[in-house]
Amino acid sequence: MEKAPPLLDLAALDIFRTVAAEGSVTRAAERLSRVQSNVTTRVRQLEADLGTPLFLREGKRMALTPEGKVLLGYADRLLALAEEARQALQPGPPAGRLRLGSMESTAASRLPAPLARLHSQWPGVALELTTAATRVLVERLRAHALDAVLVAWPPGQPADPALETLPVFTEELLLVLPAGHPHAAGPDQVQPGTLAVFEPGCTYRRIAQEWFAPRRQPMQLLELGSYHAILASVAGGGCAGIVPRSVLSISPHAALLSQEPITTITTLLTWRQGYRSAALDAPQQVLVD
């Protein structure tokens, strides 16, 4: 009778994932509070069990092989499911690890007060906050790399049956223009002809581009990495932008800008269908209070 292959060990997968994240056995051992020889042995045993190298070893640097990259996706999901099972069997107040993703605008303008309440009320919740564009956050949520995300769905996009959502904020989006810019009744009245935007995958960028789509002379795009940079560029007179009012209200550039309301959009707390954890209860409570 053919011998069955060894079962994947969760502890070994956690070590593998940490080495992949750190790119070094030394740093992974420090992070895991293990001796280096133990980390090396567990990685080599995992490679032997799977019959394939998982890392390319370049001196002290460890880089994933193509097979290692495939395993990393499964490791993220298996470890997330194991943590979900552990929390489901230990009911009680919100506690445990929570990997929360958020749009940059929401993290800056909406989350400081709720997260302060979360830390005060439930110190047992270990929060890890990541910011990115909506499309990236949803991809990471589906891949089990995040537990929940705060995102804005593009208008007209149908609901995803694989995800659950909870409306938490309503954002008013504003067209912001250099100080003294006359009232813009439509996209053709906007000058200069450059639009400051976030990276592709940002819902607000998509809304901005759709609003300017009827313009006879297409807008040039200036891709920037933060709302501070977008607002500073608009204040400098070089471009227009579309930002949430909540972001503009905390910006030192607010008094230097003209503004026009464009539309409203809902920010949704989103998680995988059927996912339950004690830690997820915390943001669900503080964000709707």
Locate the predicted segments by residue.
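Short helix-boundary/capping micro-motifs
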Residues: 17-35
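A short LG(V/I)-centered, amphipathic sequence patch enriched
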Residues: 45-64
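Alpha-helical linker/hinge and terminal dimerization helices associated
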Residues: 49-50, 71-92
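Interdomain hinge and pocket-entrance segments immediately C-terminal to HTH DNA-binding domains
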Residues: 60, 66, 89-107, 121-126, ...
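Central regulatory/effector-binding core of bacterial HTH transcription factors
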Residues: 95-158
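Hydrophobic hinge/microswitch elements
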Residues: 133-138, 142-146, 152, 201-257
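Secondary-structure junction motif
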Residues: 183, 193-215, 277-281
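A late-sequence structural motif
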Residues: 256-289
